[in-house]
Every structure is written in structure tokens, then in C-alpha cells.
Design a protein with these regions (language model features):
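Cys/His-rich short segments
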Residues: 51-101
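A generic structural signal for short
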Residues: 50, 128-129
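N-terminal strand-loop-strand
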Residues: 80-123, 128, 150-151, 155, ...
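Generic signal for short, ordered secondary-structure residues
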Residues: 28-31, 43-47, 62, 122, ...
Length: 182
């Protein structure tokens, strides 16, 4: 799919396990992982990919009702599930998370890395929004927890759906507060 295809063009996205994928295309070099190839997608295509993967992840993790443990069934074209015992309808959720470009007084940006990542993989800092917490409070908390600094000049940049597992990433910039040594 591309942004040049007419609105209403039918598209089908499927999440395949390795065996299914290799039966369609045996050359593993022709398959792309979203974390590596997603940057080259248009906004529309990235959104569709994220939506499909988030829904697939949600379905896989909600086969049973969280209230009573009974099996659930897919309803509403895959946009919901229903508990087969209680009839309760379950809907996919979106977990808000902030991702922050933290900039110091010399206009340097702070990058972090996780021990489980491959060597030389870096990212700006991110964390989920806690229940009852504002987005700005999340930025302030996360920058203090991860970098040990207080921040100012918090500015919202934009958002993007992210299917790991079903997040809405809310991007911000923030500055290290000027009265701190770092």
C-alpha cells in the first residue's frame, strides 16, 4: 500500500508465524521487521501496520475473559471480543506513553540503551503514563527516574500508534532545568 492508492482500496494485513511466512516466501531476506523497516513507511501505512499488529497482539492476549476466565469469541469484525459465559464485550485498549527528547543547555540530546538491546542501539527516553497522571507529570517523573534531572519547557510534538503491545506514543521535547549540573 502507498499513499497514492485511492481511498477505499481494499487492503489485507495478516500477522504470520515464521512457518506461515516461510511458506509464502521462503527467502527470509525478503521479510522485514517493523522495528527496522517501519521508518521507511508513509504515515498512513505505518498507522495501518501498527493498527493491525496491535489488534493481533490484543486478540492473542485476550482469548479468555479477565473477569471469569471463560473463553471469548471475536465479534464486530474483529474490533471486539465477547465473553462466552457472561456476554461481556471486551474492546482493545490503548496504553498512553510519553517519549521525550531531553536537551541540555549545550543543545545535546540524551539517549539511553537497554541491556537486552543489540550493541549500539539507542533511543530517547520513554515510559507509560501512570493512572491519574497528566502527560507533563509523566515527562517530569520519567526524566527524573531515568536521568536524575528536573525539566522545564515541556513541549508536545505529536503522536503515533505503536503496536508493542498496543501503545499510543506521545512525543515531547523538554530541557534540563538550568540550575542543575549534569
Amino acid at each position: 500500500a502507498s499513499d497514492t492508492e485511492p481511498i477505499g482500496t481494499p487492503l489485507v494485513l495478516a500477522v504470520l508465524d515464521e512457518k506461515q511466512a516461510l511458506s509464502l516466501e521462503p527467502n527470509e531476506q525478503n521479510w522485514h521487521v517493523l522495528r527496522r523497516s517501519g521508518f521507511g513507511l508513509s504515515n498512513r501505512d505505518a498507522g495501518m501496520y501498527a493498527q493491525a499488529l496491535a489488534l493481533a497482539n490484543w486478540h492473542e492476549s485476550h482469548l479468555y475473559c479477565s473477569r471469569c476466565g471463560s473463553a471469548t469469541e471475536v465479534i464486530k469484525g474483529g474490533w471486539a471480543r465477547r465473553c462466552q459465559s457472561e456476554g461481556k464485550e471486551l474492546y482493545p485498549r490503548t496504553d498512553p506513553a510519553v517519549i521525550v527528547s531531553l536537551i541540555d543547555d549545550q543543545d545535546r540530546i540524551l539517549l539511553g540503551s537497554q541491556g537486552v538491546w543489540e550493541e549500539n542501539r539507542w533511543s530517547v527516553l520513554a515510559d507509560f503514563v501512570e493512572p491519574g497522571e497528566s502527560l507533563n507529570a509523566t515527562v517530569e517523573r520519567e526524566m527524573f527516574e531515568e536521568a536524575g534531572v528536573q525539566v522545564s519547557d515541556i513541549d508536545y510534538l505529536g503522536s503515533q500508534g505503536w503496536p508493542y503491545p498496543y501503545s499510543l506514543m506521545l512525543a515531547f521535547t523538554a530541557r534540563v532545568r538550568g540550575d542543575q549540573k549534569h
